Amino acid sequence: MTDTQNRVAMGYIKGVFGIKGWLKIAANTEYSDSLLDYPEWHLVKDGKTVSVTLEAGKVVNSELQVKFEGINDRDLAFSLRGYTIEIPREAFAPTEEDEYYWTDLVGMTVVNKDHTVLGKVSNLMETGANDVLMIDGEHGQILIPFVSQYIETVDTGSKIITADWGLDY
C-alpha cells in the first residue's frame, strides 16, 4: 500500500485567522482538537501534496485554529485554503477489542446471517444513542445501528461485517 493510500482525510483548511499565518480548520473528527495529536500533516489539493509540521493549535469558540512551522504570514496561510488534511493511518492510536475507527468500517461489505450481501458501508452517522452504518447496495440504502444486537462480527482482515438484518427490515 502506498503512502497516499494509507492516509485518511481528517478535514480541510477553510480559511485564515489574523496576519501571522494562523489557519481555520474544518475537522471531520469527533473532537476537532484531536487533530492536534498529530504533529505531521499532509495537505492535498489538485494532486499536489504539501507536508507540514504543526507548531501550535487551539480551539476558539468551537473552532480549531492551527499554526504550521514556516507559515508566518497571512498570504502564505491563504495559499493553503481548500487543502484537505490527511493523516497517516498508522499514526492513529490502537483501538480496543470491538472498537473501530469509522474510516476502517467505510468500504466494508455487509452480509446478513443468510450470507446475502446487503451492500458496502458508505458512511456512518452519530445519533446520540449509537452510531449507524449507512449501507449502499443493490437493495438501496440500508441503515443498521452499530450495536451488538445487530452486528455479529466485524472482520477487518476480510473487510466483512456480518449483521443480524433481513432485507425486509
Curated annotation (Swiss-Prot):
Instruction: Specify the domain of life of the species encoding this protein.
Output: Bacteria
The protein's GO terms of the molecular function aspect are: ribosome binding
Q: Which GO terms describe its biological process?
A: ribosomal small subunit biogenesis; rRNA processing
Q: Main subcellular localization, coarse class?
A: cytoplasm
Q: Name one GO cellular component term.
A: ribosome
Q: Which SUPFAM superfamilies match?
A: PRC-barrel domain, Translation proteins
Q: Which Pfam families match?
A: PRC_RimM, RimM
Keyword set for this entry?
Chaperone, Cytoplasm, Ribosome biogenesis, rRNA processing
Where found in the cell?
A: Cytoplasm
Q: Which PANTHER family match?
A: RIBOSOME MATURATION FACTOR RIMM
User: Which family is it part of?
Assistant: Belongs to the RimM family.
What interactions and quaternary structure are annotated?
A: Binds ribosomal protein uS19.
Q: What is this protein called?
A: Ribosome maturation factor RimM
Organism, scientific name = Neisseria meningitidis serogroup C / serotype 2a (strain ATCC 700532 / DSM 15464 / FAM18)
In the UniProt record, the gene name given for this protein reads rimM
